[in-house]
Amino acid sequence: MQLTPLHVTGGRQLGGEIAVQHSKNAALPIIVATLLSSEPITLHGIPRLSDVYTILELMHHLGTRHAWVGPNSLTLHTPEIENTDAPYALVSKMRASFIVLGAILARAGTATVSMPGGCAWGPRPVDQHVKALRALGAEVIEDGGNFFAHREGSLNGSFVFELLTVGGTHNAILAAALGEGTVTLENASIDTDVVDVIEFLNALGARIEGAGTNTITIHGVKELHGGEYTVIPDRIEAGTFMMLAAATRSRLTLTNVRPDHLRAVTSKLAEMGVDIQEDGNRMVVDARGRDLKPVNVTTQSYPGFPTDLQPQMSALLATVPGTSVIQDPVYPDRLTHVAELHRMGATITVSGYTQVIQGGTLHAAPVKAADLRAGAALFIAGLTCEGETVIDGVQYLNRGYERLAERLRGIGGEVMQPEPMLAADD
């Protein structure tokens, strides 16, 4: 069934309270990490997103049985690995699925995983994943778009990542968590999602040290037991709603947030003139009546400004008079939103990974999202301007934002997604 576009009518202030979902980017590797245990595990805070259903389809192929036991609670059980391959038809849908390589290798000793897919912008190679596994004693062969991995005994040794990689760090941790070896990872990612995966594994009996630092040490254990765990809040969704409040010059209260995960975003919005108040896991973002200032932004790995919020920041800065500059060296090709914002009247000049934005007033237009975060930029832009903006490519938004239209309506947004017309033989 073809998804119908989002119809967004903006030009009004938003207000009220919106609960931030739990982190998709932590939930996906944590779901994969349940492969390391033969006992049932219940996860809380699992967003019902298309990416989650995709990874569950792959997990089912590998031998996992799952059941939703609450609106966002999921029990998974993998008594044994039934298949050690992750075929292209499943892996090609989503890049994050590649970390099953390390998990299957740890549990079964051998794994075959196809090259990953996901959002269609730019190259995001997996060479650091493969180099890490090889350095730790696994044999990994690439042939015809597939990776064949095998280990004899436990992984051991150390590896220095050549660049910061969240997925590569996940894969190496999962591969080394079981067994009798000791593995040290240097220049490892300190991303919040990596920390959450480590804390989840340790809750099941793993022995992993150094979470939140660039040096992670994994002492292999014989087995992991079952248990329960709650995934952290989604800092990217929180940042998206913070920018929505700023772009629409509104006051929004965000709940279920981790302000300590949002320092780079908070400081940049404060520099623009947005008032932000924190109270535990609540955050009030107030841009009412404020003349926001242009800023310069450069993306970095955590704890820097996240590349996953770069398109949303472009949409916000397109509404701020003056000249702003955004540089995204993390993913230089993440620019699919720019042409669509042009259709809405934005003035953005691109050179390499640099955007020079002359802020002004946007207008409604038909646009199309080509990836998840571009879609977020477009619904932010649509809610800033009068008239109806029709956003196609809703399938990408469904990868990262749960019940988006319903939740935006809850804070005063006029956002509709008509039911699709069914053919007579459907």
UniProtKB/Swiss-Prot annotation:
Main location, first listed in the record: cytoplasm
GO terms under biological process: cell division; cell wall organization; peptidoglycan biosynthetic process; regulation of cell shape; UDP-N-acetylgalactosamine biosynthetic process
Catalysed reaction, written as an equation: phosphoenolpyruvate + UDP-N-acetyl-alpha-D-glucosamine = UDP-N-acetyl-3-O-(1-carboxyvinyl)-alpha-D-glucosamine + phosphate
Entry GO terms, CC: cytoplasm
InterPro entries: Enolpyruvate_Tfrase_dom (IPR001986), Enolpyruvate_Tfrase_sf (IPR036968), MurA_subfamily (IPR050068), RNA3'P_cycl/enolpyr_Trfase_a/b (IPR013792), UDP_GlcNAc_COvinyl_MurA (IPR005750)
Any Pfam family: EPSP_synthase
Positions carrying 2-(S-cysteinyl)pyruvic acid O-phosphothioketal: C119
Keywords: Cell cycle, Cell division, Cell shape, Cell wall biogenesis/degradation, Cytoplasm, Peptidoglycan synthesis, Pyruvate, Transferase
Highest taxon in the source lineage: Bacteria
EC number(s) on file: 2.5.1.7
Annotated positions binding UDP-N-acetyl-alpha-D-glucosamine: R95, R124, P125, V126, D127, Q128, D308, V330
GO molecular-function term, one example from the UniProt record: UDP-N-acetylglucosamine 1-carboxyvinyltransferase activity
PANTHER family found in the cross-reference section: UDP-N-ACETYLGLUCOSAMINE 1-CARBOXYVINYLTRANSFERASE (PTHR43783:SF1)
Stated name of the protein: UDP-N-acetylglucosamine 1-carboxyvinyltransferase
Organism: Deinococcus radiodurans (strain ATCC 13939 / DSM 20539 / JCM 16871 / CCUG 27074 / LMG 4051 / NBRC 15346 / NCIMB 9279 / VKM B-1422 / R1)
